[in-house]
Amino acid sequence: MDYGKKKLMADDCLKTLKFVSSDVFQYKISKILLWLVLAIHGTITLVGTYFLLGKFNRKQFMNFVPSYLATFYPLLAIWTLLFRGELISNIKNEVEMWTIDSAGEKVHRQIKNQATFMTIFAVVNFLISIVGGCLYLVPLSEDVDTFVAFYLFHNYFPNQEKYLSSIYRMTFLMLGYLMIVHGYQIIYYSEHGRYQSTLLKEHVANLDSCERQTNEEKLFYDDEYQKRIHLRLVFCVKRSVKFVELIERKNREITNLIGVFSICGCLLGIGIVLHLLSGNLTEGYCLRLALLSIGTAAVFSALFWSGQTVEDQSEEIVAALHALNWYNFDKNNKKIYLIMLTNAMQTHRVKFTENYSVNYDLGVQIVKSIYSIISVMVNMI
């Protein structure tokens, strides 16, 4: 295995995922559409807040609050794309990304299969979100009693109701898409982190696989062997430091975003569950909610899974270090080995606070939060 200068990634194995989650929003027309949708739904949300708090009776409040709660997630998604849209667009320029064939054919096939699976998942879930958005283009009689916007158009702008409703419905094409975009961005970042960690792990695992003498005890006094180990250790340490720097830098960038998105995700889940509990379910609404729930649950599950795999891969690097025959290293090499082991034992996570990271535990906490809030609200009805 080569421990010299590596070829850098030219062709992104997750380019489809990057395009639908970032690149497409770099065009001027995309930004104009985002501003337009933000203006429309931001205005409706502000007016809806006034009506929910001061105008609607209890029954109306329970009818309208599910769709109201569900609007905060896409609004946050739009704001982030407009003001923090460079999150993953230049990741290849922020750290040297090795080609996925840098650690042998077996690892190459493994990473390629993982990237193919993630690409297929992204495309299928993207299509589900688009179809889900299209369903909102079809008017349902219950819309006027479910969405604040249609209630306002019907009661305050009857002459322009058809025109205003059509414009508002068109925005759902983008909203369905926006529900998955930022999950895709974190998945893209996490997956590339996992691939690069896998490549590093293979280099660590083969670090002491030099041609050995028959008597292994003599390796400690073999200057040529120790020199080769030294070069490989330094190579792996430098790579791990760059990787840690990238994770820490990205964690600083997304610290606040993940927390706020988690809160909005809870509100979205509460809105969906409240609508299911309302009993106002027709065939059309069931289909809408089914696609929304499937698409959202799928991308959130993939998000937590990707974050968890970054942690798991970090632990595998530690295991690979422990498996080395470090007792054959000389004093200087042992010091370098201990430095790398100490750094590696600090598990790398995609996190937004000291206590919470993007992993399975966060997913469980969100589900528990949704359940607790729903229980309180049901008891209040």
Residue ranges with predicted function:
Residues 74-95, 183-200, 300-324:
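Inner-leaflet juxtamembrane helices
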Residues 94-98, 203-206, 323, 327, ...:
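A short linear boundary/processing microfeature
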Residues 44, 70, 90-93, 172, ...:
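Generic structural signal for well-ordered, non-membrane alpha-helices
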Residues 86, 132, 165-168, 195, ...:
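Active-site-proximal helix/loop capping residues that flank conserved catalytic or ligand/cofactor
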